[in-house]
């Protein structure tokens, strides 16, 4: 399933666990890949900080897309994210 194809690698709790920074590895294409970030229906209170693509750090704009084999770092005030699909509304 797509949910298991994008998995959490690292989780950081900050500010008394009010903020989480979560690193995801994108092992397969999913409903968040190959779509410009501006077109994704992301939850509020969430920021895609960077995309690591083959060792190159991308500070994303709305024109960037998440691709298979990327590592994506998000920061959010939400809790309980288990996969990258959880960033969607």
Residue ranges and their predicted role:
Residues 23-89:
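Cytosolic Rossmann-like ligand/nucleotide-binding regulatory domains
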Residues 9-27:
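Internal, active-site/partner-interface "lid" segment
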